[in-house]
Every structure is written in C-alpha cells, then in structure tokens.
Amino acid sequence: MVSVVTDGTTKRPTVTFTPALKYKHYAGVETYTDGTTTDTLEMRGEVGLLTRNVKFQGDSTSEANQYGAHIMLHSGGDESLEGRFEYIELMHVGQAFNLGRYPLHFHMIGRVTKSYIRGCSIYHTFNRATTLHGVHYLTIENNVAYDAMGHTIFIEDAAETKNRIIGNLVISTKASNSLLNTDQTPACFWITHPDNIFRNNHCAGSPRYGFWFDM
C-alpha cells in the first residue's frame, strides 16, 4: 500500500510504503564547489508507472519463446495513415530473431504528422520498444520502457527526420544477440540523424549506453 500525505504549510508530499521498501533508495541533491563555481547534481531516482487500463500483450508462451505480440503500421505514402497510441500497456511484445517485429513499429510511411505514441508503457520486450523506419514528424512522448532487449527507442535508417522524442523514460535495457551486432552493447536511445528533436528524456540501467549517436 502507498499513502501520500501533503503538509498544509510547505505543500510538500510525504510518501509512505506499507510494507517498507526492501532496499534503500537515496533521493537528494548534491552540491559541489571548486571555490569559484557551484554545481548541483540531482540524485533522485526515476519512477515510471507500468500499469494502464488497456493492455496489449503476448500469450502465455511468449516469455519462454521470446515471441510476443507486435504492432506494425505500414502504408504507402505521406499521411496515408494515422496511428494514435495513448496510455496503453504493452507487455511481452516483440519477437527475437525476427526483423521488423518490434512492439510498436512505424514502417516506411513518410510524413505522419497526426500520429503519436504518448503515455504508453512498453516492458518485458524481446525486440526493442519503439522503432521508427522511414517516417517523419512522429511524436513519441511521455512513455515508459522497461526491460527491453536491444536498442530501446530506435531510429532505424538515418533517413528519418523531424520526429519528436520528448519526456520518455527508459530503464533496464538489455543486451540482445538476436538483432544487430551493436545490440550486444545496447543503448536506451539509438539516434541516427541529427534532424530529430530529443528533449527531456531519461534513461538508467543500460549495460552500456544511454544515448548512442550513430552518425
């Protein structure tokens, strides 16, 4: 059980867990100075909510076979479809060893100015979390990705531009031997073109890289 009490004077909330957390979690702000300048470092851990009311998931064999559900959007030409994914939960998704079988995959469409992936949770995946391939102007915003195999937020061909990747949290990316060679040293965010917007994203727990600029 989690309870939250807000102090009437300071307006600061106090969060209480029953039972208590099993491990110690430090949260604070550290300050460092060299005598002339002072810098601060945020040491608060990120928290992401995985549960949603609408759930899309693989079946009971997905985890053992690394063969989960997937969503692929493909259509011929600019603005030829609209894909709007908002506040849904995707679990046991993606298929290892199968090219193009990612949890959420926008594939060779061109401009998709009315499409977005927003507020979703994508976790326990077997082949990335989201993939942008040959698309422009897609918004990926305020999502949580956890325990994904391979580069998690993935821009594929270095031809994708004007996409907005904003406010996402990626935690515990895992190495994969079923994808590219670079997926053995994975990144939370795999970035292949400078003409995309990355802002206010956070990552933690990757065995190698947070943001990999492959340009």
Per-segment meaning from a language model:
Residues V2-M215:
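Beta-strand/loop edge motif enriched in small/polar residues
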